[in-house]
Amino acid sequence: MKNIQISPSILSADFSQLGTEIKRLEDGGADMIHVDVMDGHFVPNLTIGPPVIKALRKNCSLKFDVHLMISPVHKYIEAYADAGADIITIHPEATDNLETSILKIKKLNKKVGVSLNPESKIDLIINLLDKIDLVLIMSVNPGFGGQKFIPEVLNKIKKLKKIQNEK
């Protein structure tokens, strides 16, 4: 059987009750917490930074998958690693050199995620798949929760799964 992991996003949580919301997810059986970090530059929204993640980390034993929707991402990787991220997920479009950013995350002993926007091509990561622990296929344009699903991403998922099975 597949090892399926449940990783709910806290983007739509009540930020004034974030500690309580995360505790409810932990008690509910989540395997990890997906933290969307937005800078108002790479995406048109602002969320949380390293100090909030560090504070949440003190009260949660679950892994944190920190999805960095910030640019330039490379200069902030270490701050999020130090704050308590277990997985750092980045976008190819947010770095000058994806492989360098991936290697920086690995050097910090964190797992690497790469996120592909609906319009991003799989070719951006094909040659780096052996260095990536997680691929996040965005089924909406990044920046806001509650958007309409973009069905065209299903073909991207099928293509990536086929590539994975051929390795």
What residue ranges belong to the model's regions?
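Short, intrinsically disordered, charge-balanced linker/junction segments flanking boundaries
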Residues: 163-167
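Conserved N-terminal beta1-alpha1 strand-loop-helix module at the mouth
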Residues: 1-89, 93-97, 104-112, 120, ...
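Short glycine-rich anion-binding loops that position phosphate/pyrophosphate groups of nucleotides
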Residues: 140-142
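Short loop/edge segments at beta-strand edges and connector loops
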Residues: 116
